[in-house]
Design a protein with these regions (language model features):
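Conserved DEDDh/DEDDy metal-dependent 3′-5′ exonuclease domain
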Residues: 6-141
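Acidic two-metal-ion nuclease catalytic site recognized across multiple nuclease folds
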Residues: 134-155
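Short hydrophobic beta-strand that contains or immediately precedes a catalytic carboxylate
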Residues: 1-5
C-alpha cells in the first residue's frame, strides 16, 4: 500500500513530482527525470498495490495524459469522507484534524516552490515526504474501523 500525492507547482505544466509513502519510507519521483519513469509506471499500473490519496480524479487524468498509462488501484480518501457524511471536500489538513484532532502544518513556501526544479531542496523533500506519510496515517487509522473498510471496499 502506497500513498500518492502529486505536486504540480505554480505553473500548469505539472505534475512534476509524485510522492509515495509506506510506513517506513517515502519515495519521491521527479517526473521530468526519465530514469524515474519505469519504476513509477510499474507502481501506477499495478492494481494489487493500493495507492491512497485525496481527490485523485484529476491526478489520474494528469498521469494518463503524461504517460499514456491508466493508473489503477486507487483509494480516494475524499470519496471515503463524503460517504462518511462530510459534504465539503476533505483534504489532507482537514482529514488530519478530523481523524487525529491535530493541526497539520504545511509550509506555504514549500507549497509554492518550484517543483519542476531538477534538484529539489531539503525543505521540498521533507514537505513531500510528510504530505505522503500524513495521508498514509489517515488511511491506516480509518482502516481500523470495520464500517469504513466496508466503504473503502465499495469504492
Amino acid at each position: 500500500m502506497l500513498v500518492l500525492i502529486l505536486e504540480k507547482g505554480a505553473a500548469n505544466h505539472g505534475p512534476h513530482v509524485v510522492q509515495f509513502s509506506t510506513e517506513h519510507t517515502a519515495y519521491i519521483f521527479q517526473l521530468d527525470n526519465p530514469e524515474s519513469h519505469n519504476p513509477l509506471l510499474y507502481l501506477l499500473a499495478a492494481e494489487n498495490i493500493k495507492k491512497i490519496g485525496f481527490d485523485l480524479t484529476s491526478d489520474r487524468k494528469l498521469l494518463l495524459r503524461k504517460f499514456g498509462v491508466l493508473p489503477r488501484g486507487f483509494v480516494d480518501l475524499c470519496r471515503i469522507f463524503k460517504r462518511m457524511g462530510y459534504r465539503s471536500t476533505v483534504g489532507l489538513r482537514a482529514a488530519v484534524a478530523i481523524v487525529f484532532n491535530e493541526q497539520f502544518h504545511k509550509s506555504k513556501h514549500a507549497t509554492m516552490s518550484n517543483w519542476g526544479s531538477p534538484i529539489l531542496s531539503d525543505s521540498q523533500l521533507i514537505y513531500a515526504a510528510n504530505d505522503a506519510f500524513a495521508a498514509l496515517r489517515v488511511y491506516l487509522s480509518l482502516s481500523k474501523d470495520a464500517d469504513i473498510v466496508t466503504l473503502i471496499n465499495k469504492i
